[in-house]
Amino acid sequence: MTNIRKSHPLIKIINHSFIDLPTPSNISAWWNFGSLLGICLILQILTGLFLAMHYTPDTTTAFSSVAHICREVNYGWIIRYLHANGASMFFICLFIHMGRGLYYGSYTFLKTWNIGVILLLTVMATAFMGYVLPWGQMSFWGATVITNLLSAIPYIGTTLVEWIWGGFSVDKATLTRFFAFHFILPFIISALAITHLLFLHETGSNNPSGIPSNMDKIPFHPYYTIKDILGILLLILTLLTLVLFSPHHLGDPDNYTPATPLNTPPHIKPEWYFLFAYAILRSVPNKLGGVLALALSILILALIPILHTSKQRSMMFRPLSQCMFWLLVADLLTLTWIGGQPVEHPFIIIGQLASILYFSLILVLMPLAGIIENNLLKW
């Protein structure tokens, strides 16, 4: 009799994906973040589902329904803060996961990488719409400012913005549709994540050396299941520490004031994980130019496989490229800091220089470093 694990139509798929999957024997802790993202997604869907049971997507009651969840629903406060801070953990894992792909050359798996870029855009859209739902001051003004950017598109811009709003300003119709999209998108993300895994398992995982490891593979279970469980426990520990000790630390105080179109907050800014893109947007004086820079700051990731010039896949043995990579990380941290600062000297010029450096690193300096390293190999 054959093992049910290998013969059952459904269990067979799980077996090939998580149990008998041949995995490189030398993948480091940086490879843990894919499974952590899966855990984050499950956590967000579950907490979001319970929040949706008590939330009302209406401009008059949205803010008070969130207050009701925190005050009167059994353990509502922990569900709400797990969901809000879970989004931050999601993005931390996402940025590290992408950084690892960039460092070790995983972007050469074209299909997997492109699905990953689509996943990033979908997760960003979901997080943005989720931030609007509590209907605080920053929710309302954030929605107004970001959706208004589309009006920079020539000819159809204004019509497009009013179509998204469902009226002539951010109002009840906008909140209702944002709630509907925020509810459905995580399920689309789940489908995309499965596709992402499907394409990954077509080629097998990359490893730190970037060298094909077909002659040295080990089964995923028990080696990497144990390793993933350790990562999951550390993730849960970090998230619970954040939720139980400082749940508001990553939020904005302005969002605890109910939304009013009559007065604007002194500094409109998105959640911390969008600040780097927001800084790039603000660093261009022209509106359309800013919107294009904002879009390109994310879409440029799709160009990275084309810009790979090195004969080696991974940066493990490429010190010059490593310097460029860490310069990019430092630049993104600088942009994140600038995005949260007011628009005044010296922050304007720092933001502009950091934005120029961001695009220069990806489009010019990193490919150039690859070419230089290729020539050094000939010596």
Curated annotation (Swiss-Prot):
The chain crosses the membrane at residues 33-53, 77-98, 113-133, 178-198, 226-246, 288-308, 320-340, 347-367. Heme b b566 binds at H97, H196. One of its GO terms (molecular function) is ubiquinol-cytochrome-c reductase activity. GO terms for biological process: mitochondrial electron transport, ubiquinol to cytochrome c. GO terms for cellular component: mitochondrial inner membrane; respiratory chain complex III. It comes from the Eukaryota. It is found in: Mitochondrion inner membrane. A ubiquinone binds at H201. Heme b b562 binds at H83, H182. Binds 2 heme b groups non-covalently. InterPro entries: Cyt_b/b6_C, Cyt_b/b6_C_sf, Cyt_b/b6_N, Cytb/b6-like_sf, Cytochrome_b, Cytochrome_b_C_euk/bac, Cytochrome_b_N_euk/bac, Di-haem_cyt_TM. Its cofactor is heme b. Keywords: Electron transport, Heme, Iron, Membrane, Metal-binding, Mitochondrion, Mitochondrion inner membrane, Respiratory chain, Transmembrane, Transmembrane helix, Transport, Ubiquinone. It is a multi-pass membrane protein. Component of the ubiquinol-cytochrome c reductase complex (complex III or cytochrome b-c1 complex) that is part of the mitochondrial respiratory chain. The b-c1 complex mediates electron transfer from ubiquinol to cytochrome c. Contributes to the generation of a proton gradient across the mitochondrial membrane that is then used for ATP synthesis. The cytochrome bc1 complex contains 11 subunits: 3 respiratory subunits (MT-CYB, CYC1 and UQCRFS1), 2 core proteins (UQCRC1 and UQCRC2) and 6 low-molecular weight proteins (UQCRH/QCR6, UQCRB/QCR7, UQCRQ/QCR8, UQCR10/QCR9, UQCR11/QCR10 and a cleavage product of UQCRFS1). This cytochrome bc1 complex then forms a dimer. Belongs to the cytochrome b family. Heme 1 (or BL or b562) is low-potential and absorbs at about 562 nm, and heme 2 (or BH or b566) is high-potential and absorbs at about 566 nm. This is Cytochrome b. It comes from Diceros bicornis (Black rhinoceros). The lineage of its organism: Eukaryota, Metazoa, Chordata, Craniata, Vertebrata.
